[in-house]
């Protein structure tokens, strides 16, 4: 796990039931005790997402509340890649990657979770299990849950989401999976982002990235709550009022492609992390795979 040394250097290491953990020093004792309790009896902890055979998200409650994310890597090739850092990318769905991403962007933004610890079960040269400990956003609900309960809120909520996208870009990163379950609403109405397994650490082109975010957000989920023409109207109003310097020749083709068509995760990753791939996409957005 040498490729993570720069990220774990400031953390305190501890072995717990055969697992290696790196904890934020301020909370090491509390987190270590909570992790021990979880390892002994995971079934006694509340889940924060629908459990999957190899993945889970759990609530840990001590002096504070924490999120513990768990991921088991079933395939030897992925175990090898994550242990040795053979694929240093920001678009893979695993907790090693989310740890890397949040370590890169959390210092820039108050709207993302803070990393409290990272753990794994490994035997050279394979990592079998991953654990990620994060700060918990208490009394928040997802945009998805809010709109399921109150679909009529979409017209008031969407401009706030667009402003969150703009703030994200101004802070220099692009969340590649900005769907309504990954955006939380706080008790004061502020919005926050979670699930950073897929993230670009820099913004190649603001207008291109905003086109992706606003188009993808509709195609992935929000179309359940608002008609396409109504969504277009809200987008135009936001762009007119709050993005007067937007270059529409860049924004529009990207927005239209993501608004109405599915685009693979591989393509999303490549065009948001590589200037060369982004330029290629811009030349033929309608036909680019």
Identify what each model region corresponds to.
Residues 1-47:
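Juxta-kinase regulatory segment immediately upstream of eukaryotic protein kinase catalytic domains
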Residues 38-137, 170:
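Conserved ATP-binding subdomain of kinase catalytic cores across diverse folds
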